[in-house]
Amino acid sequence: MKALLDLFKQVQQPEVFDAIKIGLASPDKIRSWSFGEVKKPETINYRTFKPERDGLFCAKIFGPIKDYECLCGKYKRLKHRGVICEKCGVEVTLAKVRRERMGHIELASPVAHIWFLKSLPSRLGMVLDMTLRDIERVLYFEAYVVIDPGMTPLKARQIMTEEDYYNKVEEYGDEFRAEMGAEGVRELLRAINIDEQVEMLRTELKNTGSEAKIKKYAKRLKVLEAFQRSGIKPDWMVLEVLPVLPPELRPLVPLDGGRFATSDLNDLYRRVINRNNRLKRLLELKAPEIIVRNEKRMLQEAVDSLLDNGRRGKAMTGANKRPLKSLADMIKGKGGRFRQNLLGKRVDYSGRSVIVVGPTLKLHQCGLPKLMALELFKPFIFNKLEVMGVATTIKAAKKEVENQTPVVWDILEEVIREHPVMLNRAPTLHRLGIQAFEPVLIEGKAIQLHPLVCAAFNADFDGDQMAVHVPLSLEAQMEARTLMLASNNVLFPANGDPSIVPSQDIVLGLYYATREAVNAKGEGLTFTGVSEALRAYENKEVELASRVNVRITEMVHNEDKSEGAPAFVPKITLYPTTVGRAILSEILPPGLPFSVLNKPLKKKEISRLINTAFRKCGLRETVIFADQLMQSGFRLATRAGISICVDDMLVPPQKETIVGDAAKKVKEYDRQYMSGLVTSQERYNNVVDIWSATSEAVGKAMMEQLSTEPVTDRDGNETRQESFNSIYMMADSGARGSAVQIRQLAGMRGLMAKPDGSIIETPITANFREGLNVLQYFISTHGARKGLADTALKTANSGYLTRRLVDVTQDLVVVEDDCGTSNGVAMKALVEGGEVVEALRDRILGRVTVADVVNPESQETLYETGTLLDEDAVEEIERLGIDEVRVRTPLTCETRYGLCAACYGRDLGRGSSVNVGEAVGVIAAQSIGEPGTQLTMRTFHIGGAASRAAVASSVEAKSNGTVRFTATMRYVTNAKGEQIVISRSGEAMITDDHGRERERHKVPYGATLLQLDGAQIKAGTQLATWDPMTRPIITEWGGTVKFENVEEGVTVAKQIDDVTGLSTLVVIDVKRRGSQASKTVRPQVKLLDANGEEVKIPNTEHSVQIGFQVGALITVKDGQQVQVGEVLARIPVESQKTRDITGGLPRVAELFEARSPKDAGILAEVTGTTSFGKDTKGKQRLVITDLDGNQHEFLIAKEKQVLVHDGQVVNKGEMIVDGPADPHDILRLQGIEALSRYIVDEVQDVYRLQGVKINDKHIEVIVRQMLRRVQITDNGDTRFIPGEQVERSDMLDENDRMIAEDKRPATYENVLLGITKASLSTDSFISAASFQETTRVLTEAAIMGKRDDLRGLKENVIVGRLIPAGTGLAFHKARKSKELSDRERFDQIAAEESFEFGTPETPAAEQQHSGE
């Protein structure tokens, strides 16, 4: 009976586990896995097709070929289950055991595992403390290694050649032992006492001072400690037994024509077995040493190529001269196991087809072709047919469906009712790339898609295809319906803007209907209601754009809040409006006033309208409203009948004169160039400037002509109104085209770019209406081709960036409501060059406050700590003019494994506070990666006219208010009474009456201040001016000039100006100075007071000395009296070199990879006073003396611009040498907040240039992940090593444990890792291995005996569990708490009833261990 029941075993419950451990297998372990030794290299008998006994496919070892049937056919069928046939030795069981039973090969000589030998850094080398080169020579039989020196002067692990060996043998006889090959290496590994070595290394580390040694010891210690902790023996890195993969995983498939297709692994195994057998035979025959050695070496090579072909020497090739695919190749790379089969699987119940537009659908519907639905929902239909009794068996049901009988269609309708399907369009760049819809059955073979979701899918109907997936289980349907239904996803998760905005024709229709025309038919009429206006319109008494008065009923919020009172009450008002707007007022959702429609609706307006509707009226109303807007838009666009004709492109009459004038100016520049007045570069720049201005002028003239038209109003007066020109309306509404494109149609095409990005100086003066000639046509195609090639590259690069971002953040999930931190960042409006780039309201919307927000006027608390700021709150804050709010940020969140909801704030895609379980990491990565393809690939050349801003020489206030200086602003007053700035990083702010910052400007060193702190000014007032062409050196003290080392012809040269005849002294470049002595000195000035004493810097013993750098023009004479603030020398600023600015995608990648820029600027390490030390060859030495008198030196290349001078006080983290900032320095010297501000601002700059909106918090989430490792500075009593990098959470856990045990915790500093490094250094080895460098990751993990706790999303997808995010997080939490409570109950019962359990150890403990 039992056997019968076993037969009908239920589906096995999958094993529940919480972690996966990886390690090295000992030889015994390998033997225990095995079902027998593979002795022969044969695979199958070519005549009978049966596997050869003891061969690679042997049925005795691996199991039967057919279910429940032994090889010779003696035992067949189920009743002999589990019998082992005495004739052929095969167990009668399922054939699928051939997928899981392993074999083994007993190697005649041990073999080193190539991963531990060659994967850098070599683990074998680390453990043995030998170089890789030496170990290789021993392993491949080129040298001997001393195992046991005995009483000889030789050292253990010493390498000797064959010659040496024989000499030493003669000398010492058998006093010592030396070996060759893997046996020798294995002996050495066995001899190592790990505990002893670890102790020794730890003491060495404490006592040594040399950097190199510390590094070396720390590395070795790490490996040895890993062995110590994991209990893995180092000699297991040398294989004695080789496991053999189950045969079904390396199949041999007969092709027609008697040939076979085989997996490469079979070839590789065959070679190993052949060589192994040959070696066994040679050993038995006692063959000469040299032959045996050669065979051993070949065996080692064969095993190497089986494990990782091509890692050492030439790859083994098959018959077709291709390298064979080894075990390592099977798992790594895009086509390997991880990325091909574990992370991306093909799924059943899916189909794909072309999409077409479905304008009649509701937002939550999609049209599904009947035939597709029939196929996708087959099992559901079979079930229904059986239940209804139409068919008795599945087979009969199948027939019904195949014949497509009428009853089947009725059942299909029933089955798909309220059963959502998921639509996906590749590439799925963000979560809106997969949405759920309710299917509506349609004829035809194309899927119908709702026009409003196209923006989210980035779909158009030029042949795009989409895939359909059917959620099967009830839970899946629930989730699809509640979380993924298109009508529940109306906001972009990247920035919280509506994703269901109308575009194209819909916009055109709505725009046309809401425009107003002067003196249209029926102007001035008054209508009692919308229906009357509509009737008049249909009878052609009025036009859509006629200005009329209409009584309009609005639904407004009810003031009466009592029980049972309706939420909205009607309010009737007579509005002056147009007929079209009145008709649209019918679809307004309750709660929105008519005023939102009473204006021409352009694309931006419509987007704002939908946003307002969502915030004021909620999701449901918005969706209905958007749907109705779409219907109206399409209908009205059809009625409008807007089309394009050539006559709509009006070419401005003044074009010819404008172009003619420009050509004259260009000729003039050519003439100047010919006569040598300007350089070729200047001429080019000027010509390009002229043409771009001309192009603008023609465009402006054209737009003026296009945008208005003359009309006669009702009183007969001539007036102009906005034009009803079709092309203008299309561009103005935002439906199609833009001003730039219209300029090409009817203005002039303008300047074109070459493929290298430089600008061709001859413009295309024609436009498309006039037509281009051949040269013009060629010029325009020239740069355009580069654009197309760029696009292809861009897509790949952008995809790779997204992949890296997802990988670094995939384990970041919101796991709790509040971590209780009191840290945050101060948010201010983002100001650049005096312009507000991003208002404060946009930056704090949806964030949680970390300090009370106080009303600046009444000092009362408006919003307490912990308030989530919504739209109303930020508007109030803006109204009150609060200019800084401290908010929570993901960067400072103290949750260990994940984030808390308070630090994250609002979930932008839902418009409410973020839910626990939201995978915010992946959302952040997608939000940054998704617009990647819109970013440019090119680097900008500054120097062309394309982006050459005129050099600023002053700052002007843009608003009225009070001038305020920052704390870093320092200035002196000179003899003329002017204020001269002497600080490098001073900024001037303009604040309004409430003290809110309105704008801020950097004021450079040497500028003259025209307004002082506290001055009341009007907009347009100049704050400061300076000479843009030179950088002055200014004295802060008065006195008599005394030159030092200023010798004409030695350190300075006299320069005479050709035009003016004046002479000045110039400091000569070090390289051009003659004598050796003059190379080291530095020309400088000291100041003497009235008594001839050197002027001292106040409060110090240092005398004032002001150095002149190379190239400075000295403007004072020796012995001259100077006043405070006077200029001693000027340094000409090199005319803006045409440096490339990295822009676009490469810049974003550079920031996230945390790469140090090439010539990074140098930041001051400490706060203190600067002075210059002795210069070395080509370098100048800058010394900062800190407040305690310690000196810190910097060596700076001579050609760099030093931003400080002698005696200047600098703050820690201030830039002292010009250059791009290095993010690592910012983190080290200014802290996490400054770093995050730097990265966020820089990344946002790139996206803002392309007009892409991304919320700051997404970038902050990535930065948090880049900071997730820390470097241990002092290890205290912890298990860490100084200088080691560890996970922050790991370190905090360890420190908590130390504090609990009253031991010393470790101290640490933050480290910034690029996203690739951060992904690879994650705690989860499964996730890291599936990302990049699979071999290295797995090697490292195996030695450390790493345990993967399956915390992230990726690892869980790979092992096939529910991901710990969203509903999966709740599932895992519930499962764990149930396990806990079960265990507690068990312990309780065990305590109460004292009977003996069958097993000595309690199952509770077992349960704990089974999770490993």
From Swiss-Prot:
Cellular compartments per GO CC: DNA-directed RNA polymerase complex
Region feature (Disordered): 1391-1412
Cofactor annotation: Mg(2+); Zn(2+)
Binding site for Zn(2+) 1: C70, C72, C85, C88
Principal EC category: transferase
Cofactor: record remark: Binds 1 Mg(2+) ion per subunit. Binds 2 Zn(2+) ions per subunit.
Catalysed transformations (reactions): RNA(n) + a ribonucleoside 5'-triphosphate = RNA(n+1) + diphosphate
Residue numbers binding Mg(2+): D460, D462, D464
Entry-linked Pfam families: RNA_pol_Rpb1_1, RNA_pol_Rpb1_2, RNA_pol_Rpb1_3, RNA_pol_Rpb1_4, RNA_pol_Rpb1_5
CDD domains for this protein: RNAP_beta'_C, RNAP_beta'_N
EC number: 2.7.7.6
This protein's record includes keyword Transcription: yes
Any single biological process term in GO: DNA-templated transcription
Matching InterPro entries: DNA-dir_RpoC_beta_prime, DNA-dir_RpoC_beta_prime_bact, RNA_pol_asu, RNA_pol_N, RNA_pol_Rpb1_1, RNA_pol_Rpb1_3, RNA_pol_Rpb1_3_sf, RNA_pol_Rpb1_4
Keywords of the record: DNA-directed RNA polymerase, Magnesium, Metal-binding, Nucleotidyltransferase, Transcription, Transferase, Zinc
Family named by the database record: Belongs to the RNA polymerase beta' chain family.
Subunit structure: The RNAP catalytic core consists of 2 alpha, 1 beta, 1 beta' and 1 omega subunit. When a sigma factor is associated with the core the holoenzyme is formed, which can initiate transcription.
Chain's role: DNA-dependent RNA polymerase catalyzes the transcription of DNA into RNA using the four ribonucleoside triphosphates as substrates.
Protein name, UniProt field: DNA-directed RNA polymerase subunit beta'
Originating organism: Paraburkholderia phytofirmans (strain DSM 17436 / LMG 22146 / PsJN) (Burkholderia phytofirmans)
